[in-house]
Amino acid sequence: MAISTELKAEIVKDYQRAEGDTGSPEVQVALLTARINDLTPHFKANTKDHHSRRGLLKMVSRRRKLLDYLKRTDAEAYRALITRLGLRK
């Protein structure tokens, strides 16, 4: 269920602003998106797993808050990130 260390390191490398950057909103949103996408098939197979669904909803909410922050502080980076992650249609 959890994303592998290698995948996490690759995501951090792809979205970091500078070398060693793991805390920027772009990196955090990309990691949350990977975890959310990893959990989605689980809920298609296990529709009654409400305990894990709550965790998923918390992750979605946290990602939404980070995206709102990024949009408020750096709109250009926000647009680039949602395009790159494919979050908006």
From Swiss-Prot:
GO terms for biological process: translation. The gene is rpsO. It comes from Laribacter hongkongensis (strain HLHK9). This is Small ribosomal subunit protein uS15. One of the primary rRNA binding proteins, it binds directly to 16S rRNA where it helps nucleate assembly of the platform of the 30S subunit by binding and bridging several RNA helices of the 16S rRNA. InterPro entries: Ribosomal_uS15 (IPR000589), Ribosomal_uS15_bac-type (IPR005290), uS15_NS1_RNA-bd_sf (IPR009068). GO terms for molecular function: rRNA binding; structural constituent of ribosome. CDD domains: Ribosomal_S15p_S13e. Part of the 30S ribosomal subunit. Forms a bridge to the 50S subunit in the 70S ribosome, contacting the 23S rRNA. HAMAP family: Ribosomal_uS15_B. GO terms for cellular component: cytosolic small ribosomal subunit. The keyword Ribosomal protein applies. The keyword Ribonucleoprotein applies. Keywords: Ribonucleoprotein, Ribosomal protein, RNA-binding, rRNA-binding. It holds the Pfam family Ribosomal_S15. Belongs to the universal ribosomal protein uS15 family.
